């Protein structure tokens, strides 16, 4: 099906272009979302009449998105989840969780604007892409931890596995010292 794009669509084209897409993609996504019109004579004429208005509207939303992007870019948000000792989450962190974390911090971000390559299933710092406008994309960091204290440690650069290894090494050292003291005490008797 041929459609006229009313806004820039990633991997498809710019506003005003007539592109060929699969019927289902047009019917189920582009047309209902208002991102495109069917490419027939009457729609092409009406688009040409509205083109200046649509470009002005697109420029305005891009400016608003750029203003939000300036504040949002590089921000870090803490997401508290329960996890195993090895750092594997019970469940996963999804786009909804990322959007809620950003909203709680005072940013207006919808879950459809968050782009995850795959769901986050382990503790640590994860970089996530936020598409505020088709032409305005920023990166944020999600700090996934079991507690606020753990999140602060991760933010300072220490991983959970490193901390567990340090604690285990310290415990082994204390046990070795204890045996040395017991051995020294038994030799004195």
UniProtKB/Swiss-Prot annotation:
Q: Which domain of life is it from?
A: Bacteria
Q: Which GO terms describe its cellular component?
A: ribonucleoprotein complex; ribosome
Q: Which GO terms describe its molecular function?
A: rRNA binding; structural constituent of ribosome
* InterPro entries noted in UniProt: Ribosomal_bL9, Ribosomal_bL9/RNase_H1_N, Ribosomal_bL9_bac/chp, Ribosomal_bL9_C, Ribosomal_bL9_C_sf, Ribosomal_bL9_N, Ribosomal_bL9_N_sf
List all membrane-crossing ranges. Answer: none
Q: Which UniProt keywords apply?
A: Ribonucleoprotein, Ribosomal protein, RNA-binding, rRNA-binding
> Which GO terms fall under biological process for this protein?
translation
Q: Which Pfam families match?
A: Ribosomal_L9_C (PF03948), Ribosomal_L9_N (PF01281)
Q: Does the keyword rRNA-binding apply?
A: yes
Residues making up the signal peptide according to the UniProt record: none
Alphabetical list of SUPFAM superfamilies matching this protein? L9 N-domain-like, Ribosomal protein L9 C-domain
Family label: Belongs to the bacterial ribosomal protein bL9 family.
User: Matching PANTHER family, A to Z?
Assistant: 50S RIBOSOMAL PROTEIN L9
Q: Which NCBIfam families match?
A: L9
Q: What does the protein in this record do?
A: Binds to the 23S rRNA.
Q: What is the protein's given name? A: Large ribosomal subunit protein bL9
Give the source species.
Cereibacter sphaeroides (strain ATCC 17023 / DSM 158 / JCM 6121 / CCUG 31486 / LMG 2827 / NBRC 12203 / NCIMB 8253 / ATH 2.4.1.)
Organism classification: Bacteria, Pseudomonadati, Pseudomonadota, Alphaproteobacteria, Rhodobacterales
């Amino acid at each position: 099906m041929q459609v006229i794009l009313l806004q820039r669509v990633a991997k498809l084209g710019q506003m005003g272009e007539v592109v060929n897409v699969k019927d289902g993609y047009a019917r189920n996504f582009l047309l209902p979302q208002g991102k495109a019109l069917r490419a027939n004579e009457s729609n092409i004429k009406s688009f040409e009449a509205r083109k200046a208005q649509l470009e002005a509207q697109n420029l305005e939303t891009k400016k608003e998105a750029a203003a939000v992007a300036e504040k949002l870019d590089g921000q870090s948000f803490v997401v508290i989840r329960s996890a195993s000792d090895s750092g594997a989450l019970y469940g996963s962190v999804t786009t909804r969780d990322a959007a809620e974390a950003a909203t709680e911090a005072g940013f207006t971000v919808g879950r459809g604007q968050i782009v995850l390559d795959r769901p986050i299933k382990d503790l640590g710092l994860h970089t996530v892409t936020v598409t505020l406008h088709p032409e305005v994309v920023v990166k944020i960091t999600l700090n996934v931890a079991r507690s606020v204290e753990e999140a602060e440690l991760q933010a300072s650069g220490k991983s959970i596995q490193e901390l567990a290894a340090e604690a285990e090494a310290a415990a082994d050292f204390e046990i070795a010292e204890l045996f040395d003291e017991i051995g020294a005490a038994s030799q004195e008797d």
